[in-house]
Amino acid sequence: MPLNRGHGMSKHLRSARHKALIAALKAARESAGITQRELARRLDRAHSFVGKIESGERQLNVLEFCEYADTLGADGAELLRTVLRARG
């Protein structure tokens, strides 16, 4: 079955799980004592990359998620468990 690219994406950007992911990533960054700008530098990305993720404007693919978590020194599996516990 083909993927329905783009259709319904905005629904996912407002889902409880996406909000839980944003909150978990932001909490991990703040716990690490890293600013958005510093995280972007460490990821070799534009500052807007982190800002758009934390504002809910952009989703991460799985590889970006792993890189993000690793850069923060966070346990990616635990972050995912937090997201999976969210409903909706």
Regions found by a protein language model. Give the residues of each.
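Short, charged recognition helix plus adjacent turn
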Residues: 1-11, 70, 78-88
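A short, Lys/Arg-rich alpha-helix, primarily the initiator
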Residues: 2-31
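Short, basic-rich loop-to-helix N-cap that marks the start of a DNA-contacting helix
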Residues: 57-69
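Recognition helix of helix-turn-helix/homeodomain-like DNA-binding domains
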Residues: 43-60
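Short basic helix-loop element that most often maps to the first helix and adjoining turn
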Residues: 23-42, 67
